């Protein structure tokens, strides 16, 4: 049963809704604060660019984000208000590097009609009050006292009902607002009011301005001494103030919704319009009076939702419809006449209108191909989990036991040799002049035995460790310079070396430490430990990159890892790992300036410890499971940053982000050995030994999800994959802004599913929109077809009265129209249904069968249908059952009866939900998403006693996701390994307007109960930012009701357990009555779902 569901984010929201700039984390630190609907990010502006400081979830959808500075404060505070009428004031705690809540509260009113044009939240420039316009006809005031604390809020009646914008004016003795509104004749005006705090009322303000541009939609208040306000229309920009100064300029018709102030005195503003054009508006002024306005074209950016001017001509452009950008404004134009230079792009998947899941490598791992972005910023995005290795060369080699790369001299930036070790020999490969790998010889090395370790050393030497000796060989002559032999009767089992030190272990627990001095190997220390040694490492992590003062040693028998000091091999710390599995690989490493000891076991588990590089102390012990086979650890470098590669049956890259260790799976089946091989021909590449093969490849950017962009310059709205023809097809449309009239042209486009090359295009008729697309086959026909459902959207019709179903075959990479069928409405949804085609057309569900005509051609013939919907927008099928998501009437269940060849309604959910997506989790449980950002599940009551109960779909789960879901589809972003318990858990992927990709996993009941307990324990330990309540945030909420979340768990909260400090983890584990190791392991397993 899929009643118990776990909801988790695989890709966080990326649509930028707000941004602001100020001194938040320190008086002299300039911060960019970005809101992405339900998250905020704080960045620090440094000479090197923007540096991320913190990225936190907010338990609400952010409606207002404003910085302000109360009296007597040296840095800014942050005011946030949410769509569900909660607010908070945040302050930065520099010592703890975290957000403090200064104030919070609820500003909802029992009565009142929520505003149509969205909430407005503004702060008086002199910090006397916060103003909120949340309900028609009301202006809510939260006053500050003279210490900067918030006092009780009150409402003032506002006679303007259709408010478009409100701002506070600068430089007013009494707090003054300016209101842009529309009257009942659709004319637009501005009016000013003073806020009388004592009387809790408005006083008619100093001025007003009537009959503005019909498209006036944005107010920009100008700082003192100029003062006044700029009113941005669609065809004019106007400046006016209390001294009845009135200045206006015409502009080319556009809709401007985003602005950013450049100078503190407010004489220049950046304006972004709906076509992504950036303009500079200049107020010319003399003696503190505005004399005129000038507007200049700067260039093109993404379509801006927010513009924040940072410093030195650098601007952050936040976008909801495309990638956000960091741009530089240049004084000179480039050859295309643009002053805008893009410094950095921040990927945004929003709005995800549709997606399909494609398993290209047939590994049971889905890639998600999304229809993302809007208007000119529309694109397809290919999203996959894990890090890809792009193979450049490979050769068949059996039985590889180890790999090392060597340089031709110590200071050479590039690697020259690849040392490949086998059970009874060692072979040497080198790059030749044609950049090909060929076999070579290093005369001083012993090629007749297995190599245990190899390394470049100081004085241009090479080190080779074998079972019976350590050899020093000259880089230049390649001859043997010095040799240390293992004592009679002993052989070396494991070894490690760096540029000046060698550490090796022989049988009987002997540990020998050598140093290279004057091109000689000197035995410095020899000790015997009480057990056999299983692995050693002395990778330098201190100041000196050529010398380590610490060594790590893994032990048999007592299953421990020890930190020893060098050169005297004194024990500093012994850490018992517990269990019976021997450590197989230890590694000392520094990632993002933090030192770690990593210790990998023979069963695929990995321990990580924070390591104090000067004292050798170990803290913050954590254990994760990476695979089931022994792991070997190696560092490598990519784009100048160090990471760790863990070779095993599930190869993993361990990397650090925001000083936290993250694990990303590598998209390879099994890796036995890896070493970095940084050659001039293929920089930053890796040599990888798999079963029977050695390959050289480059590695993707190190991150958990990889996103590839296919820019379209138009908007894709429906997409589908067809494995047989190796193609993707999608419906898209382009805005034509050439004429006075805006028009759209709609297409069906075909792409190669591997290269994403455009293969073919089919243009739809004028006014015809593509609404749905599927790949399917029909009874008694072996071909596979793309079926496209369309609608004719005519300007004079409220609802389309005609559409078409188009059936295409892919022939030689081209779309061939085989059949078309006219319909009496929009074809909102199509499904393959038992060898037939099921269509949702306006209010009706219609079934078509595929008929062969006498002339050998085909046609779609109507078989039966079912009425009874307002608009049937979404359909899913399973066997003979059909689930319908309606515009307003929630979810209903239909069944196709073969004998009568009819479709009948079995049951429905009688709640009024405006649906945005549906999916069948299994035969009994169906999931839906609706337009108040909730998701819910319903159950078919086939065993109920009465007809009435059987006819009702029972709501069994409810949850506030806080995201508008456009599509739910079965699939997985990760490899499903049949041996792991997570491999058996069914998952559904969802995509949202804010660019979130999420996973809904249906859990077994006992696991759900355990995690539910963990969630309620964690709520006590992890407080919401601004003290916002998690329980309230996740409660199902619409206009009619609010009810507690049930049968859904918040995976993001549960997985944040892994970010807690060790002490907090232990407290949570104590509350759960479960050992901390087991709790970590269970939560780690869940992260494998995405």
UniProtKB/Swiss-Prot annotation:
Location within or outside the cell: Nucleus
Single GO term (MF): damaged DNA binding
Family the entry assigns: Belongs to the DDB1 family.
Leader peptide range in chain numbering: none
InterPro entries: Beta-prop_RSE1/DDB1/CPSF1_1st (IPR018846), Cleavage/polyA-sp_fac_asu_C (IPR004871), Quinoprotein_ADH-like_sf (IPR011047), RSE1/DDB1/CFT1/CPSF1 (IPR050358), WD40/YVTN_repeat-like_dom_sf (IPR015943)
Tissues/organs with expression: Expressed in proliferating tissues. Highly expressed in shoot apical meristem (SAM). Expressed in roots, young leaves, flag leaves, and panicles. Not detected in mature leaves.
BP GO annotations: DNA repair
UniProt keyword annotations, A-Z: DNA damage, DNA repair, DNA-binding, Nucleus, Ubl conjugation pathway
Oligomeric and partner information: Component of the UV-DDB complex, which is composed of DDB1 and DDB2.
Protein name: DNA damage-binding protein 1
Function, in words: Required for DNA repair. Binds to DDB2 to form the UV-damaged DNA-binding protein complex (the UV-DDB complex). The UV-DDB complex may recognize UV-induced DNA damage and recruit proteins of the nucleotide excision repair pathway (the NER pathway) to initiate DNA repair. May function as the substrate recognition module for a DCX (DDB1-CUL4-X-box) E3 ubiquitin-protein ligase complex.
Chief subcellular location: nucleus
Source domain of life: Eukaryota
Gene, per the UniProt record: DBB1
One GO CC term, this protein: nucleus
């Amino acid at each position: 049963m899929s009643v118990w569901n776990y909801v988790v984010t695989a890709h966080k929201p990326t649509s930028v809704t707000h941004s602001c700039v100020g001194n938040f984390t320190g008086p002299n630190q300039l911060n960019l604060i970005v809101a992405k609907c339900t998250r905020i990010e704080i960045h620090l502006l440094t000479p090197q660019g923007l540096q991320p400081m913190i990225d936190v979830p907010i338990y609400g959808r952010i409606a207002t984000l404003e910085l302000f500075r109360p009296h007597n404060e040296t840095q800014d505070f942050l005011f946030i208000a949410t769509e569900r009428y909660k607010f908070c004031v945040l302050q930065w705690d520099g010592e703890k590097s975290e957000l403090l809540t200064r104030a919070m509260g609820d500003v909802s009113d029992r009565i009142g009609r929520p505003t149509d044009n969205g909430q407005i939240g503004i702060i008086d420039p002199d910090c006397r009050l916060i103003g909120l316009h949340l309900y028609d006809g009301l202006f809510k005031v939260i006053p500050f006292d003279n210490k900067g604390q918030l006092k009780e809020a009150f409402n003032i009646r506002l006679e303007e009902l259709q408010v478009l914008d409100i701002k506070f004016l600068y430089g007013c003795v009494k707090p003054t607002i300016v209101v842009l509104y529309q009257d009942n004749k659709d004319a637009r005006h501005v009016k000013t009011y003073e806020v009388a705090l004592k009387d809790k009322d408005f006083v008619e303000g100093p001025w007003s301005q009537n009959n503005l541009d019909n498209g006036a939609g944005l107010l920009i208040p100008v700082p003192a001494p100029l003062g006044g306000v700029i009113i941005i229309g669609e065809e004019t920009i106007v400046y006016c103030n209390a001294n009845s100064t009135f200045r206006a300029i015409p502009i080319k018709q556009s809709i401007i919704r985003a602005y950013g102030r450049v100078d503190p005195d407010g004489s220049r503003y950046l304006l972004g319009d709906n076509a992504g054009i950036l303009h500079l508006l200049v107020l010319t002024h003399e003696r503190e009076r505005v004399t005129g306005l000038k507007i200049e074209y700067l260039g093109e950016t993404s379509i801006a939702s927010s513009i924040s001017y940072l410093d030195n001509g650098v601007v952050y452009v936040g976008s909801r419809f495309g990638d956000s950008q960091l741009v530089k404004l240049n004084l000179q134009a480039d050859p295309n006449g643009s002053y805008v230079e893009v410094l950095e792009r921040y990927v945004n998947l929003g709005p995800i209108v549709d997606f399909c899941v494609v398993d290209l490598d047939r590994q049971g791992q889905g890639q998600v191909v999304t229809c993302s972005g809007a208007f000119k910023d529309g694109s397809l995005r290919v999203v996959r989990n894990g890090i890809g290795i792009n193979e450049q060369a490979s050769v068949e080699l059996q039985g590889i036991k180890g790999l090392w790369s060597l340089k031709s001299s110590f200071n050479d930036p590039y690697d020259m040799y690849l040392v490949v070790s086998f059970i009874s020999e060692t072979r040497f490969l080198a790059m030749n002049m044609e950049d090909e790998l060929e076999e070579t010889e290093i005369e001083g090395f012993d090629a007749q035995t297995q190599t245990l370790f190899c390394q470049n050393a100081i004085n241009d030497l090479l080190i080779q460790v074998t079972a019976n000796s350590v050899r020093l060989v000259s880089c230049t002559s390649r001859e043997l310079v010095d040799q240390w032999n293992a004592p009679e009767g002993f052989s070396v089992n494991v070894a490690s070396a760096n540029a000046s030190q060698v550490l090796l272990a022989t049988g009987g627990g002997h540990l020998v430490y050598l140093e290279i001095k004057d091109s000689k190997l000197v035995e410095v220390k020899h000790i015997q430990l009480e057990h056999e040694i299983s692995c050693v490492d002395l990778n330098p992590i201190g100041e000196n990159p050529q010398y380590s003062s610490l060594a790590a040693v893994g032990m048999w028998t007592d299953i421990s890892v020890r930190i020893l000091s060098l050169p005297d091999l004194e024990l500093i710390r012994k850490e018992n790992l517990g269990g019976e599995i021997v450590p197989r690989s230890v590694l000392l490493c520094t990632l993002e300036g933090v030192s770690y000891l990593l210790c990998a076991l023979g069963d695929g588990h990995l321990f990580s410890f924070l390591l104090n590089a000067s004292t050798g102390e170990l803290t913050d012990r954590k254990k994760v499971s990476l695979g089931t086979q022994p792991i070997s650890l190696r560092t490598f470098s990519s784009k100048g940053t160090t990471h760790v590669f863990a070779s095993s049956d599930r190869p993993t890259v361990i990397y650090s982000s925001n000083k936290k260790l993250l694990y990303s799976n590598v998209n390879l089946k099994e890796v036995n050995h890896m070493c970095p091989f940084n050659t001039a021909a293929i920089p930053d590449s890796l040599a990888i030994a798999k079963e029977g093969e050695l390959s050289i490849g480059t590695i993707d950017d190190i991150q958990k999800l990889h996103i590839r962009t296919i820019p379209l310059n138009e908007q894709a709205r429906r997409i589908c994959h067809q494995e047989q023809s190796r193609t993707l097809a999608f419906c898209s449309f382009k805005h034509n802004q050439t004429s006075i009239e805006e028009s759209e042209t709609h297409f069906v486009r075909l792409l190669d599913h591997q290269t994403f090359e455009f293969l073919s295009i089919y243009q739809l008729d004028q006014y015809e929109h593509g609404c749905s697309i599927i790949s399917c086959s029909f009874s008694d026909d072996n071909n596979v077809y793309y079926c496209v459902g369309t609608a004719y959207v005519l300007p004079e019709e409220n609802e389309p009265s005609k559409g078409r179903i188009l059936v295409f075959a892919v022939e030689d990479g081209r779309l061939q129209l085989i059949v078309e069928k006219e319909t009496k409405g929009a074809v909102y949804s199509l499904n393959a249904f038992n060898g037939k085609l099921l269509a949702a057309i306006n209010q009706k569900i219609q079934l078509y069968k595929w008929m062969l005509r006498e002339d050998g051609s085909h046609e779609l013939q109507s078989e039966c249908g079912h009425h009874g919907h307002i608009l049937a927008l979404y359909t899913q099928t399973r066997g003979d059952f059909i689930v319908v998501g309606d515009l307003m009437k929630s979810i209903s269940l239909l069944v196709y009866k073969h004998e009568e060849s009819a479709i009948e309604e079995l049951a429905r959910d009688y709640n009024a939900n405006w649906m945005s997506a549906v999916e069948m989790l299994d035969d009994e449980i169906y999931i839906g998403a609706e337009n108040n950002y909730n998701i819910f599940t319903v159950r078919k009551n086939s065993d109920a006693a009465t007809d009435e109960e059987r006819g009702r779909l029972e709501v069994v789960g409810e949850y506030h996701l806080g995201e508008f879901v456009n599509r739910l589809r079965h699939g997985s972003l990760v490899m499903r390994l049949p041996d792991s318990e997570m491999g058996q858990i069914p998952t559904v992927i969802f995509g949202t307007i804010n660019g979130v990709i999420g996973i809904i996993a249906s859990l077994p009941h006992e696991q759900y109960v355990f995690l539910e307990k963990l969630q309620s324990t964690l709520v006590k330990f992890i407080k919401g930012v601004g003290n916002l309540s998690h329980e309230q945030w996740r409660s199902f909420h619409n206009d009619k009701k609010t009810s507690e979340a049930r049968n859904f768990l918040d995976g993001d909260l549960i997985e944040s357990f892994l970010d807690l400090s060790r002490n907090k983890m232990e407290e949570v584990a104590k509350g759960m009555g479960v050992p901390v190791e087991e709790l970590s392991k269970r939560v780690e397993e869940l992260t494998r779902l995405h």
